[in-house]
């Protein structure tokens, strides 16, 4: 559901840039924290986006053009695919541009929301090693993320709170398994505008790196019930310095049913 279901912010970083502790967790566009709400059964959504992560002294990654596709394959079950191009800039190394790692996943909501309980779901993902890690365009090995997400709406849906987290399993050379989690609060302001802010933290992603915590703000504009413009900017507030951002276009089809 587009109102709260935002996918995929951070690209899969690679090589030296990963060792420099990149943002390794993707989340609901344009935020890092995800939600448990799948695409409606028989519906589809597509994102075309770019995103960036700049770490002074360590380099930068710009993802784009990238495409995300989500399908409501069954009631309460969504299939997920991201195919990104990526540009990496690392001090002392040649710039690289090309196809990076492919993300696939399945979102399953096993508790639906009611007046007294939140909705809860899992969203396991695999980052397939389709990029050229020798050029810093991929991890070099397939790795996995295993999160659980919780969401509750308030005041007739004007306020929405998402929280949750999980574990990333990455056994590529120089990489580490780590935990991650976040808290996101969003407010619908009417006239097709929603804004939100979040705190997101993750453990050390690579040998020699440190845990990092981010503060991120953003939102989306809905010119119609099928099309949206997404945006966010953020910065680390603990750990290694990172400046991040996301801009994307979203389209859902067929037209959502009227509430």
Predicted features and spans:
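Bacterial N-terminal signal peptides that target proteins for export
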Residues: 2-13
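Bacterial N-terminal signal peptides
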Residues: 11-22
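Transmembrane beta-barrel domains of Gram-negative outer membranes and organellar outer membranes
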Residues: 25-259
């Amino acid at each position: 559901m587009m109102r709260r279901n935002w996918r995929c912010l951070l690209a899969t970083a690679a090589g030296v840039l990963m060792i420099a502790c990149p943002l390794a967790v993707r989340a609901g566009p344009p935020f890092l924290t995800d939600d448990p709400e799948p695409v409606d059964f028989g519906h589809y959504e597509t994102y075309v986006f770019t995103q960036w992560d700049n770490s002074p002294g360590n380099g930068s990654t710009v993802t784009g053009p990238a495409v995300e596709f989500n399908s409501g394959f069954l009631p309460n079950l969504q299939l997920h695919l991201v195919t990104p191009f990526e540009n990496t800039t690392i001090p002392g190394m040649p710039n690289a541009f090309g196809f990076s790692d492919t993300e696939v996943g399945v979102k399953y909501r096993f508790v639906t929301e009611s007046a007294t309980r939140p909705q809860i779901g899992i969203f396991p993902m695999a980052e397939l090693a389709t990029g050229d890690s020798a050029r810093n365009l991929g991890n070099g090995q397939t790795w996995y993320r295993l999160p659980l997400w919780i969401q509750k709406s308030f005041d007739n849906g004007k306020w929405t709170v998402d929280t949750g987290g999980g574990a990333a399993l990455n056994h590529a050379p120089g990489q580490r398994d780590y935990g991650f989690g976040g808290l996101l609060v969003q407010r619908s302001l009417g006239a097709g505008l929603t804004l939100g802010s979040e705190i997101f933290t993750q453990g050390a992603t690579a040998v020699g790196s440190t845990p990092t915590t981010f503060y991120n703000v953003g939102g989306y504009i809905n010119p119609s019930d099928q099309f949206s413009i997404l945006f966010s900017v953020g910065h680390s507030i603990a750990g290694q310095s990172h400046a991040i951002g996301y801009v994307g276009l979203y389209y859902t089809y067929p037209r959502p049913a009227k509430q």
